[in-house]
């Protein structure tokens, strides 16, 4: 057992709910610290304002402002940490002394001057925070003003201010905190997005995505339409011909972006025959009437009814083992482990509402590895894992949504026709249709903000 610090002050006690988890017990990060200081400032402000004259504004103002300022410093340092994690785009950044620097003006200047050059999406957040951080830096640049009445040169702090209004302070800090939280969300989103590897020296994934939307369909490449699109794209994003070519290669090789040029990437292990074999067996495990009943009930209720659960239990006692055996015999004969893993990855990709198409390939690798380990234990173990997946009622919808999202429209049509689900297409594809429309809207907004580019006019919706 590891040694732990024994202390009469900083230790756990009763009641248990009053114990705070610190250190490795919860592993708080810099954002957790920032949130704590920000919350403390707001709680103190609330108490001072709610209990007029009970808590002296003249004394509470110091911990309030110190907590506010320190929260802002930590939020900015967290953003700089993430800025340095943006793959190859961050390699040219100058070093930053995260521990030694407490000058919030310097901290902000570093982020403000470098972040938009890494990714243009930072610009609007920088613009929204610049004046506010400047105000903080003008009063307390190094975090000393609200901690001590005098500075190192024995100069009295805050002589030029005299009065700070707590009501106004609360309003302004709420605004600043909201913008800092927005910065935190954007930084975390970009850190994950860049981890996918879909970017070039000067283009983010979103830029490449917009380029995909501006290109004509793949069948028209080599025509005047492609040359015109290339000229518009190079002008809008200020990129060389070589970088344009790199962006085009990313578009062609990205499952999600390839749909925008009407050239969906085939699945590695499944064609229509594999899907037919899978769903023929799936309908052997899931009663057709139950499937249709599930499709026609409240879309917000994705669970089976208690009555259905009871029927399923009785059916399993009376003969479900036989149905599982028949389904497994068919699936194991007609589908490879990799094909099953690919189908399950389509379902899992959509079930977890992943934002990026690249995550499907990550899911496929993970699920195929999991199934391989099950098979290494024994075929029965592998078969149970596959059957447990196949018995899930939402599998059909999840797979269809994923196929629709990746532009496999003909395959979706074949599956709907084969299983007499065409009348339920709107319900089955509602979510993926919304996401397809939303990604087009996102491209349009990005192009509107950053230079007035336009879509090819033939982007699949």
What positions do the PLM features span?
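Domain-scale activation on soluble regions of proteins
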Residues: 1-461
């Amino acid at each position: 057992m590891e040694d732990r610090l024994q202390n009469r002050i900083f230790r756990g006690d009763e009641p248990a709910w009053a114990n705070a988890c610190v250190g490795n017990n919860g592993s708080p990060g810099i954002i957790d610290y920032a949130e704590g200081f920000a919350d403390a400032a707001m709680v103190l402000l609330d108490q001072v304002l709610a209990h007029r004259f009970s808590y002296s504004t003249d004394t509470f103002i110091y911990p309030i402002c110190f907590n506010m300022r320190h929260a802002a410093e930590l939020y900015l340092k967290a953003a700089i940490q993430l800025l340095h994690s943006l793959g190859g785009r961050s390699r040219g950044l100058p070093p930053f002394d995260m521990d030694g620097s407490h000058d919030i003006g310097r901290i902000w200047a570093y982020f403000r001057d470098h972040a938009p050059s890494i990714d243009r999406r930072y610009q609007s957040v920088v613009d929204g925070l610049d004046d506010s951080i400047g105000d903080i830096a003008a009063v307390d640049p190094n975090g000393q003003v609200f901690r001590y009445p005098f500075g190192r040169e024995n100069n009295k702090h805050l002589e030029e201010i005299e009065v700070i209004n707590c009501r106004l302070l609360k309003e302004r800090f709420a605004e600043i905190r909201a913008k800092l939280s927005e910065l935190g969300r954007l930084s975390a989103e970009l850190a994950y997005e860049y981890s996918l590897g879909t970017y070039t020296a000067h283009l983010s994934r979103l830029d490449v995505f917009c380029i995909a939307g501006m290109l004509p369909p793949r069948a028209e490449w080599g025509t005047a339409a492609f040359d015109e699109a290339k000229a518009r794209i190079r002008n809008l994003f200020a990129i060389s011909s070589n970088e344009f070519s790199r962006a085009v290669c990313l578009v062609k090789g990205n499952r999600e972006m390839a749909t925008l040029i009407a050239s969906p990437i085939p699945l590695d292990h499944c064609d229509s025959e594999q899907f037919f074999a899978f769903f023929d067996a799936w309908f052997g495990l899931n009663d057709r009437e139950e499937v249709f009943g599930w499709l026609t009930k409240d879309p917000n209720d994705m669970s089976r009814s208690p009555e259905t659960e009871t029927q399923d239990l009785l059916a399993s006692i009376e003969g479900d083992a036989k149905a599982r055996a028949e389904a497994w015999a068919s699936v194991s004969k007609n589908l490879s482990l990799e094909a099953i893993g690919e189908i399950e990855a389509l379902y899992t990709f959509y079930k977890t509402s992943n934002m990026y198409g690249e995550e499907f390939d990550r899911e496929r690798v993970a699920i195929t590895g999991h199934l391989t380990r099950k098979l290494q234990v024994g075929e029965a173990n592998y078969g149970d894992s596959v059957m447990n997946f196949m018995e899930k009622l939402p599998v059909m919808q999840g797979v269809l949504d994923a196929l629709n999202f990746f532009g496999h429209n003909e395959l979706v049509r074949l599956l709907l026709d084969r299983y007499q689900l065409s009348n339920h297409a709107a319900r089955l594809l509602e979510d993926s249709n919304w996401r397809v429309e939303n990604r087009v809207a996102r491209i349009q907004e990005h192009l509107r903000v950053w230079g007035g580019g336009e879509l090819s006019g033939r982007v699949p919706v």
